[in-house]
Structures are given as structure tokens and as C-alpha cells.
From Swiss-Prot:
Organism for this UniProt entry: Mycosarcoma maydis
This protein's name: Protein CSN12 homolog
Classification via InterPro entries: Csn12-like (IPR045114), PCI_dom (IPR000717), WH-like_DNA-bd_sf (IPR036388)
Sequence ranges assigned to domain PCI in this UniProt record: 246-442
Family as reported in the entry's similarity comment: Belongs to the CSN12 family.
One GO biological process term: post-transcriptional tethering of RNA polymerase II gene DNA at nuclear periphery
A GO molecular-function annotation: double-stranded DNA binding
Length: 454
């Protein structure tokens, strides 16, 4: 496809308000991109403009600049693809490395996105252009990740070279700024006709913004996006495509989880899981990564098959297997050993679930105490005993079966903590060394216990 034919295709799609056709034309991959590369001709900006202007129609603003930069990006990306990713010092015919070519591809495509977002922010009605906005944002983010990855490999392999003033994730940070502008262009639409509003692209872009912020470890910036959404007059979330609902509710749930708002996190993550397509196993695994710790805190244990490391989902979730077993049986020793395992600890810290799992230890202690209580003989009135001596509890927890090395004073402190947090109903008669349990519901169901975050 010659540049002039490419330009005519863009003109036709614009006149027809065909966002899907434009998305296909401005995609980095696909048949159109491959066809355009075959007959690109003069790759200099001036030469490209001349080639584009040979079209039969008029390529107005911002489409001419977008076409030039898009074709430049395709050219740079094709040269980068011809170089091996493992050989960071390999150069093409013009003496440029893969890292440099990917940087050029990103910069050129960033100019495409910037020009379109400026145009899109004033477009009324603008809903027809949402497919193009989506593909531009997706491709920009993908190029940013590729360029930053190549730059990192080059900087690591060329340690002998003079130090350059480069920053990690430089392009991804620029991508985040562009995505923010795209989000503003969608949410700020004042078109009275909601059916044709740009607001229908809000949650699509928000999903990309959240994903980018999480990769940049700038999770706090997501709060600004949520505040803007709450203040905006948007259609109900349920009116958007289900895929966008799943993504949005997943990230809202994770944000609530990281902020230790476990009730809210459970609500959002549960809704996201229920709407997730049954074949989207990777997405289900991501959701369950945070939902399972919340469920453990509430005393709801996953089925063992869900944590089976031989299944696609289980491989990602198997790290929770020792904790669910310990919580089910009250095996505090096994819980502590799993938490102290360097591999498990590293995995939990990386996911951001370590603190939540650590908090489940109180629930495991409560299960242990209840198990001991249930093993005691009944009173003459055929009821469970409500007075347990600390000496008895200390002896029970020190047996070879349980193996907890607590002194009586430490055990008393643990019991007082469980009572304070609501895991046990009763009080400690310190002077007599007796735990006095409530005659009714001495061990409340875990789902009814408020999760302490201090």
C-alpha cells in the first residue's frame, strides 16, 4: 500500500466516521501495517509528506501529521524487529541499535496519539472515534514497555560505556501522561446526547491507566482517577461492556485491598470474578490472588482443587495452600513455618498480600483454641465448659502435636488479644488464671468478626 493510498483510506474512513477502519489503519501490527511498509518509499519526513499528498482527496489536520508519524513509527519498529533482542549492541544498516529504534518508534507514535487526543477532545459527537482511541492507547503502551525493556537491557549489557542520564520506565511514564489526557478527553465531554458521548470510552482508558500506574508502582495516583470518576456524570457502570466492568472492579478491589479496606475489596473482587469469562483463566487467577487472602480473613476457605499446582490457575495460587491447611486445622506452627519460608515470603511481598496473610494468623489461633475447647469433656449438664485454666491451655498448646513454645504469660497476652479483636467472647480472670468464655457463641463465626488493621 503506497502512502497516497493509505492517505485516501484515512480520508474515506474519516468522512464515513468509521472508527473501526481508522483503528485498523493506525495499528502497529496487522495486514495494513505490513502492506504500508512494503511500499513506504522515502522515509524522510519531507518525502513522506510528498508521498501522502499524492492522494486523490485532501488530508487535513491532524490526519496528515498522524499519518507521517505513524509511518515513521512503523519504519523504526520494523528495523528494531530485524535486530535480535538478546544482542543489545547489534546495529542496523544506519548504525542504530534495537533500543534506539524502539525509542524512535515510541516517540513517533506518541506524536500520533498526542495529535489525535487534541483533536478528539473537541470532537462532537465523538463516540464513533473510540475504536481508534483504544488502539492508539494500547499500541502506545505496548511500545513504551518494549522501548523501556530494550533500554534496560542495553544499559545493563553496556556497563563499560559512559553513564547516561536515563531514567527507568521513561517512556512508560510519558505514556501514562498521554493516557491521562485521553481519560480527560473522554470524561469531560459535555455533549447533551449521551448516546454519542465520548464518555463511553472512559472505563476502557481507565483500565489502561490503572495497569500503567501499577506497573510504574505509582498506585497512589489511581485515587485521583477514582475521585474524577465519582465526581463525573457518567452512565452506570453496568451499561458498559462486561470486559470493562471486570477490569475496573478488579483494580478498585485491589486498591481497596492494598488500603486494608477488606470488606470493600471483597465486594469488588467478588463481583469482578463473577463477571469474568469462564475461559479467561489468567484474569481469574489475578482476581483470586487478592480475593483468597480476603476470604481467609473471613474464614472462607477455597476448595483444595483451586490451589492445585498442576492446574493453570493453581500454579499461581499454590502459595496460599499451606495457609489454608493451617487455618482449617488450627495448625499455628505450620502457619508460622510457611510464613517464614523465604520463597513464600518473597512471593507474598511481591503480590502485596503478605500483610493480609499475616493477619490470618489470629484466625488460625482462634481455630486452635476452639479445637482445644471442643476436645474437652462435657459438663454434667451436657454443656461445654466455660472456664478454662491457663495452665490447661498452656499444657495443651505445648504438646508434641501442637508444639507452641509460649510461656503462660505470653499465652495470656495472646488470649487477651483474641478477645480484644473479637475472635473470642469472654474475659480473663487474671488473679485466678482462668479464661472465662461466654456461654453463648464463645467463638463467633469469622465472617462476623471485624478485621483489625492495627
Amino acid at each position: 500500500m503506497k502512502p497516497s493510498i493509505f492517505a485516501d483510506a484515512v480520508i474515506t474512513a474519516c468522512q464515513a466516521c468509521d472508527g473501526h477502519a481508522l483503528a485498523e489503519l493506525f495499528a502497529i501490527g496487522g495486514g495494513v501495517a505490513a502492506s504500508a511498509l512494503l511500499e513506504l518509499g522515502d522515509v524522510r519526513p519531507g518525502g513522506m509528506i510528498c508521498s501522502l499528498r499524492k492522494c486523490s482527496g485532501y488530508l487535513g489536520s491532524p490526519w496528515e501529521d498522524m499519518c507521517v508519524n505513524h509511518l515513521r513509527s512503523l519504519y523504526s519498529f520494523s528495523l528494531a524487529s530485524s535486530l535480535p533482542a538478546s544482542a543489545s549492541d547489534a546495529v542496523d544498516g544506519e548504525g542504530k541499535t534495537r533500543s534506539e529504534r524502539l525509542g524512535e518508534a515510541f516517540d513517533a507514535y506518541n506524536s500520533v496519539v498526542s495529535a489525535f487526543v487534541r483533536y478528539f477532545s473537541t470532537l462532537t459527537p465523538g463516540r464513533w472515534a473510540l475504536p481508534l482511541l483504544r488502539i492508539l492507547c494500547l499500541n502506545l503502551r505496548w511500545l513504551a514497555v518494549q522501548a523501556d525493556s530494550a533500554a534496560h537491557i542495553a544499559s545493563v549489557s553496556n556497563t563499560w560505556a559512559p553513564t547516561r542520564s536515563t531514567q527507568p520506565n521513561k517512556r512508560l511514564e510519558e505514556c501514562a501522561r498521554q493516557l491521562n489526557k485521553a481519560f480527560s478527553a473522554c470524561i469531560a465531554d459535555r455533549n447533551a446526547d449521551m448516546h454519542e458521548s465520548r464518555k463511553w470510552g472512559t472505563y476502557e482508558v481507565v483500565g489502561m491507566v490503572f495497569k500503567t500506574y501499577f506497573r510504574l508502582k505509582s498506585v497512589g495516583l489511581c485515587r485521583n482517577i477514582l475521585r474524577a470518576i465519582n465526581a463525573a456524570d457518567l452512565p452506570d457502570l453496568c451499561a458498559y461492556p462486561r470486559s470493562q466492568q471486570v477490569t475496573f472492579r478488579y483494580y478498585v478491589g485491589v486498591l481497596a485491598f492494598l488500603n486494608e479496606e477488606y470488606d470493600h475489596a471483597e465486594l469488588e473482587l467478588q463481583a469482578s470474578l463473577q463477571m469474568c469469562h469462564r475461559c479467561a483463566l489468567i484474569n481469574q487467577g489475578l482476581i483470586l490472588t487478592y480475593l483468597i487472602p480476603v476470604k481467609l480473613l473471613k474464614g472462607s476457605l477455597p476448595h483444595p482443587s483451586l490451589l492445585d499446582p498442576t492446574t493453570p490457575i493453581g500454579r499461581k495460587l499454590a502459595v496460599y495452600q499451606p495457609f489454608t491447611r493451617a487455618l482449617r486445622t488450627g495448625d499455628v506452627k505450620a502457619f508460622d513455618q510457611a510464613l517464614a519460608n523465604p520463597t513464600i515470603e518473597s512471593s507474598l511481598v511481591k503480590r502485596g498480600t503478605y500483610i493480609a496473610i499475616e493477619r490470618a494468623r489470629d484466625a488460625t489461633l482462634r481455630t486452635l483454641l476452639k479445637t482445644i475447647w471442643l476436645s474437652l469433656p462435657l459438663n454434667p449438664t451436657n454443656t461445654r465448659p466455660t472456664r478454662l485454666t491457663l495452665t490447661l491451655l498452656h499444657h495443651a498448646t505445648s504438646t508434641d502435636l501442637i508444639r507452641l513454645k509460649y510461656s503462660i504469660k505470653e499465652l495470656e497476652w495472646i488470649l487477651a488479644t483474641l478477645i480484644y479483636k473479637g475472635y473470642v467472647k469472654g474475659y480473663i480472670a487474671h488473679e485466678r488464671g482462668v479464661l472465662v468464655l461466654s456461654a453463648k457463641d464463645a467463638f463467633p463465626a469469622l465472617r462476623t468478626v471485624a478485621i483489625a488493621t492495627t
